[in-house]
Amino acid sequence: MKQRLAILGSTGSIGVQTLDIVRENPSLFEVRMLTANRNWQRLAAQAREFDADTAVIADERYYGQLRDALAGTDVKVYAGEDAVAQVAAGGDTDVVVNALVGYAGLAPTVAALGAGKKLALANKESLVVGGEYVMRLAAEKRAPILPIDSEHSAIFQCLVGEQSPIRRLIITCSGGAFRDLPCEKLADVTVEQALRHPQWEMGGKITIDSSTLVNKGFEVIEAHWLFGTPVEKITVLLHPQSIVHSMVEFEDGAIKAQLGTPDMRMPISFALMYPRRATRPGERFDFMAHPQLTFAGVDRAKYPALEIACECLRRRGTAACTMNGANEVAVAAFLGRKCAWLDIVRAIEYALGRASFAAAPTLGDYAEANDEARRLAAEYLAL
């Protein structure tokens, strides 16, 4: 029987690649619901191609355009962030793919898990912001979470079938766009430079987060919540080739690693198909083309965001939510050429140093912390 999919953020990088998987396996998947933030043209085209039941545009200003573009079809059209969350909880889907970017992904994650859905999660911010709440809800509803992030998919695959305790998780890191750039030159980097990721093809925000290593810090937090591993047992290693996606070291000294070419369709396919694997077309990994795989420690002075994220995890509460909110504002400002690249982490530090803190947060506390962090970051950047 076909799996019925709701794809949240279908017009973004992960959403588009998820639909690539559907095209490769038309007998396995049925696209029921699609959502986008503003790109109504692509959303309409996707809804037509995959004969979706429902299309939702989060930005209500584009409702009319989407409705008109889908006139004459049977596609139901809705608008607004509440509608996105309602789609996530919809009763006629089996799997929710959360490919949204940022804090906006939290409410749909909560809605999907609350309805007991299988969640294929690319929106790491759901766990960065509200990991304790989200994992407790998933356990209560017995709703499985399958990570789409390549690093966490790799760890998940390494842990399948294992019952022994682990010594540590080893998350690999490409180093981002400025891996080989001296610290003294970081003050003058441009948006165009920051968007040139050396290995992965991703959306703009996550590519900037990769350049600051905010993304890697968030992945440490995500790994903690997904696998119940304390921050002291999570190691980040620089691995420029991006072939080893992550590793798990066990108590007996054995290490399992998951390898593959840098292609997000592999972890997406794994999340959708687990516990099976799909037969995928395309070029296979050639060991002869990669005779050398190298690893190194991360320069934490050059990339302070990694330690900031680890400290937020140690503090728990709303600390990571504050970091995320400030980062979202600062990255948008950088992409809009309203601040320097170095100002991104400075804005995060400013917000964390001034924000209020809730030790045992509710969903309402997360919302308040996000709003406060965004205000403080904007204050620092004079936006």
Name every feature range the model reports, one short phrase each.
Residues 1-383:
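Catalytic, metal-anchored helix/loop core of enzyme active sites in primary metabolism
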